[in-house]
């Protein structure tokens, strides 16, 4: 496992403090590309109407909202996050959506029954979890057999030109954003470190497979600065035997 045994209290503190400016910060740091990436991921998912989805580390609810629209009024979407303040922002944004429920909880101990959801997503949240593999195994547990898991996260660019740009961005641009938006050095440093230290796409794919997911495929975005991992929980072939 990477050296990302995150301190829960520290991460919780960071997101409690940045909750009200998180959406704006996300837009600026990604140059609003996160919206483009998520739209493409939703297209790849092909979410069916009337299904049940879980958005892990839902934050302020952007992906939760996209899932709500996709499953329609007969479907259900649950968002879960460990930051109460982030959830409060999310609740304001989803107040008119009757098929959405937001709950407080831990990605490594999901408070749901086994085989509960058709889709489980996590967007820009896995890097903030103390143990990636434990969280992925929990996502597998609550996913229905044959269900789909999707992760959209920052990644490590592989193309030389993007690797150079990425390094320059972290060295010169991120500090400016951090000083503008973070209340403390701790917040700024965490936002930077959690992104830069996150595993590359091939290592993360292996983690998905170790967690029990099958047919895992990867799609890179913007030269590899972000990546989608999409996989499935194995179908239960014992039914009907």
Swiss-Prot record:
It is an enzyme of class 2 (transferase). S-adenosyl-L-methionine binds at residues 60, 81, 106-107. One of its GO terms (biological process) is menaquinone biosynthetic process. GO terms for molecular function: demethylmenaquinone methyltransferase activity. Its EC number is 2.1.1.163. Pfam families: Ubie_methyltran (PF01209). Keywords: Menaquinone biosynthesis, Methyltransferase, S-adenosyl-L-methionine, Transferase. Gene3D superfamilies: Vaccinia Virus protein VP39. Coiled coil: none annotated. It catalyses: a 2-demethylmenaquinol + S-adenosyl-L-methionine = a menaquinol + S-adenosyl-L-homocysteine + H(+). Signal peptide: none annotated. Pathway: Quinol/quinone metabolism; menaquinone biosynthesis; menaquinol from 1,4-dihydroxy-2-naphthoate: step 2/2. Belongs to the class I-like SAM-binding methyltransferase superfamily. MenG/UbiE family. HAMAP family: MenG_UbiE_methyltr. Methyltransferase required for the conversion of demethylmenaquinol (DMKH2) to menaquinol (MKH2). This is Demethylmenaquinone methyltransferase. It comes from Staphylococcus aureus (strain JH9).
């Amino acid at each position: 496992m990477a050296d990302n045994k995150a301190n829960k209290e520290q991460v919780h503190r960071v997101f409690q403090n940045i909750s009200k400016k998180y959406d704006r910060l996300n837009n600026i740091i990604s140059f609003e590309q996160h919206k483009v990436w998520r739209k493409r991921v939703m297209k790849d998912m092909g979410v069916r109407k009337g299904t049940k989805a879980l958005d892990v580390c839902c934050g302020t609810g952007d992906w939760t909202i996209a899932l709500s629209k996709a499953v329609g009024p007969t479907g259900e979407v649950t968002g879960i996050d460990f930051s109460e303040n982030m959830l409060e922002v999310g609740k304001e944004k989803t107040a008119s959506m009757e098929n959405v429920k937001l709950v407080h909880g831990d990605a490594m101990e999901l408070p749901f029954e086994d085989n509960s959801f058709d889709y489980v997503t996590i967007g820009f949240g896995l890097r903030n979890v103390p143990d990636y593999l434990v969280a992925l195994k929990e996502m597998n547990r609550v996913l229905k057999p044959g269900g789909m898991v999707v992760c959209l996260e920052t990644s490590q660019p592989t193309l030389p030109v993007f690797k150079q740009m990425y390094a320059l961005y972290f060295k010169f641009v991120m500090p400016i954003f951090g000083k503008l938006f973070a209340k403390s050095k701790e917040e700024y440093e965490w936002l930077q470190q959690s992104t830069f230290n996150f595993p590359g796409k091939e290592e993360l794919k292996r983690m998905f497979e170790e967690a029990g997911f099958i047919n895992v495929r990867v799609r890179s975005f913007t030269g590899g600065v972000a990546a989608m991992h999409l996989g499935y929980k194995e179908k239960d072939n014992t039914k009907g035997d």
